[in-house]
């Protein structure tokens, strides 16, 4: 009999139901460096105290169940249980609280995002005592980070592979996203790449449909890449979407891409799943392929402010599972993204060490212990007038991706690509000369139109296009104080 069992045997077994807070609410607990820490936004049902709600989250996402069980005596709950160690009210909300929960590291399988999420965001999200529950942030301890390989290559290795430095990379999603034949699709890629873009991209729902089978698409896109490289003298790429119905088929597509000699492939990591994504990331690392990640389905999980998982958590999970790029919103385009929140998880994707900063929605200090960084991808409803803001917001280590903002150019794809490249080069040069992109951005673009007719035409087409809707996911503030200001 183990010492743990001997300790428990003397306590005896008392059947029945008891409040979670008696066991799992421990405000005196001092967190350990090896604990996984979670910040949950908890909305209890009427009549449920916040301490009980927080304790229920800790219990149901670790060792607890709805009643006392005799097998509790066969292990040490003090060693393995999750602990709610803090509760704080959410400013401006009547019945929402941030519950802080600490999990012992031994609860989780090494190198498995799948297992981590199965525990922390599993059945507890359907718990009846909670009206709503949202995972706002995680602190991943360095001991656990070191069990993950992370991105296949990372930012610096990608720049070295592409031989491109000192500016954001430029991309384009081929449109229409569905319906083109493989040959016409490849032609669209070629026109964009020869015009000055670094990458073109499969849309997230392009897999292997009757109108364009994956092998045909891969062949014609590879032809486009090599032809554009020969003409421009620059390394080019196309995000070949390897996402498939099975992991075996996904890896078969990745192998074919490697045999073609292309530099990068793509995966839809949420619809494809973390197990598939980690497997694909390992293959890319071993075979010299960059891996672009699309976040299709993320808004189902992260858009509601009081329920689900915040994207900063999904971004951390992707950095652990593996990917060299990930879509991160634009702040200025057609998709959801509040500026400070977006900058917060962009830092979490790129930097080695990120301090706690609630003004950016970061609840915990995170040390990635040299895990490679991920390039954020700004994509969705952006065009040349957005270039100064995008360059200022995202900086050099990013990918700026213009789909309609390239292919919608009145003169065609190649002139659309030229317009974007000229606008980017103008913004980077102006920034390097000390000009303020935030205040002088429109003037910088207008100056560049004087020597680029392609840019002038693009500016004329999109001069009235704006996406002015309030973000759903915003930082918490005291609403009463805001009204008085």
Curated annotation (Swiss-Prot):
One of its GO terms (molecular function) is magnesium ion binding. It is found in: Plastid, Chloroplast. Residues 1-2 form a propeptide. The disulfide bond which can form in the large chain dimeric partners within the hexadecamer appears to be associated with oxidative stress and protein turnover. The modification N6-carboxylysine is found at residue 201. The basic functional RuBisCO is composed of a large chain homodimer in a 'head-to-tail' conformation. In form I RuBisCO this homodimer is arranged in a barrel-like tetramer with the small subunits forming a tetrameric 'cap' on each end of the 'barrel'. RuBisCO catalyzes two reactions: the carboxylation of D-ribulose 1,5-bisphosphate, the primary event in carbon dioxide fixation, as well as the oxidative fragmentation of the pentose substrate in the photorespiration process. Both reactions occur simultaneously and in competition at the same active site. NCBIfam families: PRK04208.1. This is Ribulose bisphosphate carboxylase large chain.
């Amino acid at each position: 009999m183990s010492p743990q069992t001997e300790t428990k045997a003397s306590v005896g077994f008392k059947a029945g139901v008891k409040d979670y807070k008696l066991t799992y609410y421990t405000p005196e607990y001092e967190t350990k460096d090896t604990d996984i820490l979670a910040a949950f936004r908890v909305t209890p049902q009427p009549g449920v105290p916040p301490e009980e709600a927080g304790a229920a989250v800790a219990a149901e996402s670790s060792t607890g169940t709805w009643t006392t069980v005799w097998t509790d005596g066969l292990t040490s709950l003090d060693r393995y249980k999750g602990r709610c160690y803090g509760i704080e009210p959410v400013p401006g909300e009547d019945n929402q609280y941030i519950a802080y929960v600490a999990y012992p590291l031994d609860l989780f399988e090494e190198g498995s995002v799948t297992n981590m999420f199965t525990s922390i965001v599993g059945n507890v999200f359907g718990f009846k005592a909670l009206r709503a529950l949202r995972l706002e942030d995680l602190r991943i301890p360095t001991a656990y980070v070191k069990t993950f390989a992370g991105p296949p290559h990372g930012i610096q290795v990608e720049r070295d592979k592409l031989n491109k430095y000192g500016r954001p990379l430029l991309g384009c999603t081929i449109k229409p996203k569905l319906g083109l034949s493989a040959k016409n699709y490849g032609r669209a890629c070629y026109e964009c790449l020869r015009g000055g873009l670094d990458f073109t991209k499969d849309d997230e729902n392009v897999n292997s449909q009757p109108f364009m089978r994956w092998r045909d698409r891969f062949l014609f896109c590879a032809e486009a890449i090599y032809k554009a490289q020969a003409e421009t003298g620059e390394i080019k790429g196309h995000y070949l979407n390897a996402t498939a119905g099975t992991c075996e088929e996904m890896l078969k597509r990745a192998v074919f891409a490697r045999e073609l000699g292309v530099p990068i492939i793509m995966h839809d990591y949420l619809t494809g799943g973390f197990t598939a994504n980690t497997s694909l990331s390992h293959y890319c690392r071993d075979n010299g392929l960059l891996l672009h990640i699309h976040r299709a389905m993320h808004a189902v999980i992260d858009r509601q402010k009081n329920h689900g998982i915040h994207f900063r958590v999904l971004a951390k999970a992707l950095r652990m599972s593996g990917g060299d790029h990930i879509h991160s919103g634009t702040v200025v385009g057609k998709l959801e993204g509040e500026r400070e929140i977006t900058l917060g998880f962009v830092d979490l994707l790129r930097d080695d060490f990120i301090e706690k900063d609630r003004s950016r929605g970061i609840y915990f200090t995170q040390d990635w212990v040299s895990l490679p960084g991920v390039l954020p991808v700004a994509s969705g409803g952006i065009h040349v007038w957005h270039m100064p803001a995008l360059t200022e917001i995202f900086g050099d280590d990013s990918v700026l991706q213009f789909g309609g903002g390239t292919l919608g150019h009145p003169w065609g794809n190649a002139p659309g690509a030229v317009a974007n490249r000229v606008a980017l080069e103008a913004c980077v040069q102006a920034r390097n000369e000390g000009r303020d992109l935030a205040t002088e951005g429109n003037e910088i673009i207008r100056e560049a139109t004087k020597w680029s007719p392609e840019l002038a035409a693009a500016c004329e087409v999109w001069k009235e296009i704006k996406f002015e809707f309030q973000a759903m996911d915003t930082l918490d503030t005291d609403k009463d104080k805001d009204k008085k200001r």
